[in-house]
Amino acid sequence: MSCCDLAAAGQLGKAGIMASDCEPALNQAESRNPTLERYLGALREAKNDSEQFAALLLVTKAVKAGDIDAKTRRRIFDAVGFTFPNRLLTTKEAPDGCPDHVLRALGVALLACFCSDPELASHPQVLNKIPILCTFLTARGDPDDAARRSMIDDTYQCLTAVAGTPRGPRHLIAGGTVSALCQAYLGHGYGFDQALALLVGLLAAAETQCWKEAEPDLLAVLRGLSEDFQRAEDASKFELCQLLPLFLPPTTVPPECHRDLQAGLARILGSKLSSWQRNPALKLAARLAHACGSDWIPVGSSGSKFLALLVNLACVEVRLALEETGTEVKEDVVTACYALMELGIQECTRCEQSLLKEPQKVQLVSIMKEAIGAVIHYLLRVGPEKQKEPFVFASVRILGAWLAEETSSLRKEVCQLLPFLVRYAKTLYEEAEEASDISQQVANLAISPTTPGPAWPGDALRLLLPGWCHLTVEDGPREILIKEGAPSLLCKYFLQQWELTSPGHDTSVLPDSVEIGLQTCCHIFLNLVVTAPGLIKRDACFTSLMNTLMTSLPSLVQQQGRLLLAANVATLGLLMARLLSTSPALQGTPASRGFFAAAILFLSQSHVARATPGSDQAVLALSPDYEGIWADLQELWFLGMQAFTGCVPLLPWLAPAALRSRWPQELLQLLGSVSPNSVKPEMVAAYQGVLVELARANRLCREAMRLQAGEETASHYRMAALEQCLSEP
């Protein structure tokens, strides 16, 4: 058979075999097409390549285009098998005058025919051809060669068929398909649009695996798409808006793409658009805000105007969607707008290096207030049957972000919604596994198939903690929260989260949000200790909380990098101990002694004597561990000193325990070794408070202080109360 015959067989074979995409016009059954049966028999009995080629040619003549059905296709496969197409794909010895690609084209055409059967598309003999097929996508050749184009089409048909099988995407990614598709798209050769379509499908099916296997190539595609987006002047810019979110990496968007993406979005959103044109742009902007914060927006006038435009559009969309009862809500668009509103909240509350000027902040806060009012209006209408829907979770999230920064406005509406928020948080807390799934659904709904990051925490209560911290300071909201059972829920939540930090858990892999959530819980409890002490005394959940604080602090104060959490736990425990001083658990039990020893360690290690050049006397200075976080720590430290002072007369065993720790002696020694001028008045007052109560509570403490030059030190620092106490017998 000549080269021309081979080519003809390939092309004619394609005409018949590839007709599987069409609906069968006739059902070629055995009894109705004896000619086909005879040719299939010849194909089965062929003894060499030439006979197989000839038989294939006869089969294609017997089966007209559009006549082939799945059964006939399978019988052709049974006659040909995989051995022959395998040889065609890998042979390096073509007949004289016949280009190699003619043989490969026929091999790919046969595979494409077989892959029309889903069972064959997942066959190992097809899967092991993936690397070979990928080479055809990137091979150089004559762009006008019809045979080569046909082979590329068949290659994409094979890969697309494999992608449609249950485990197909995984096999394609492992076989290097993602890189090959990226290179084929970037080369803009024949079929590059098919490469992009298949890439989109693989990213949608297995995004994480795609990025793991081919990150450099995918980033190159992202750069190319971003440049196209920035330059696009026609309708393609709207198509790119829908494509680009899929190509944003799960970690950080490359800075070199920021300018193009922002410029393209600015041009779209700055125009008068219909909703179908605007919504993909809002979703892309939300995806960028989720991944990059405001880093993708340029500094300066243009950037601030663009950010203001984004937030304005988002707020308008939210109000239009949520204020009208009975209106169908486009939840994916509104959730994207929530992400843009959250970006606006962050920028409006940023003191340094904010993109916005003060007048812009004032204007945006007013606009966002109206949108948050619409969110509250929506949540007030949510029935129990909808509480597990992802969109409700997203709505609670944006409300939580607002309440974390602003509780003075919309006070009446917020108070009206508080009972719902407590019930909602309790429902998701009690079904923690489903709540985590809701968080995943929110990420899918809002932005892209990307796995949620820190921006989408897995429980509703954590979203509400900052706002509740502010609200527990106010009488009205606090009474509602107490009435609805929020304190008991918070105690349970704190104990559950604390388990994640206990021995046996790897705290190094804990997200920061867990520790921040624990600290915020402590702040809420501190507010309740001060404003509702009766609640602490009567609610049994606080007894359980106190027990956990006592058993946990000794190990916590020893852990590097967790000083701020230790400060919260120590201060909260000391304040609660004053209210629960009659509890059996605080009567000198091992747990209570361990807790107070750890609290003394926290309070006593805050300051040290530091030598100063050119001076004989040292100065009082912060310890290295405390110095970097003192701005966040100092209020807790002073409150802890005050609380410890209040515990001394209530717990008779505490003063002797403090004496055994040598804290009073070391404190006087520290004060005696530094210049009094280096000790601020508030520090003097805090130290004197502790020393006076210890001296009053225990004779041995007074004697130890006198031996440590306590009276002289008290005189130097004008501690009149301490000086008088030590002068007494």
Curated annotation (Swiss-Prot):
Biological source species: Rattus norvegicus
Taxonomic lineage from the root: Eukaryota, Metazoa, Chordata, Craniata, Vertebrata
Record bears the keyword Phosphoprotein: yes
Gene it is expressed from: Ncdn
Role noted for this protein: Probably involved in signal transduction, in the nervous system, via increasing cell surface localization of GRM5 and positively regulating its signaling. Required for the spatial learning process. Acts as a negative regulator of Ca(2+)-calmodulin-dependent protein kinase 2 (CaMK2) phosphorylation. May play a role in modulating melanin-concentrating hormone-mediated functions via its interaction with MCHR1 that interferes with G protein-coupled signal transduction. May be involved in bone metabolism. May also be involved in neurite outgrowth.
Family: Belongs to the neurochondrin family.
Sites of Phosphoserine modification: S2, S448
Keywords: Acetylation, Cell projection, Cytoplasm, Endosome, Lipoprotein, Membrane, Methylation, Palmitate, Phosphoprotein, Synapse
Identification of the protein by name: Neurochondrin
InterPro entries with a match to the protein in the record: ARM-type_fold (IPR016024), Neurochondrin (IPR008709)
Modification Asymmetric dimethylarginine occurs at: R75
The keyword Cell division belongs to this UniProt entry's keyword annotation: no
One Pfam match: Neurochondrin
One of the GO biological process terms: neuron projection development
Expressing tissues: Expressed in brain and in peripheral nervous system (at protein level). Weakly expressed in neurites.
Induction statement: Upon tetraethylammonium (TEA) treatment.
Modified how: Palmitoylated. Palmitoylation by ZDHHC1, ZDHHC3 and ZDHHC11 regulates the association of NCDN with endosome membranes. May also be palmitoylated by ZDHHC7.
Subunit relationships: Interacts with MCHR1. Interacts with SEMA4C. Interacts with DIAPH1 (via FH3 domain). Interacts with GRM5.
Subcellular localization: Cytoplasm, Cytosol; Endosome membrane; Cell projection, Dendrite; Postsynapse
Mode of membrane association: Lipid-anchor
Positions bearing N-acetylserine: S2
A cellular-component GO term for this protein: neuronal cell body
Lipid moiety-binding residues (S-palmitoyl cysteine): C3, C4
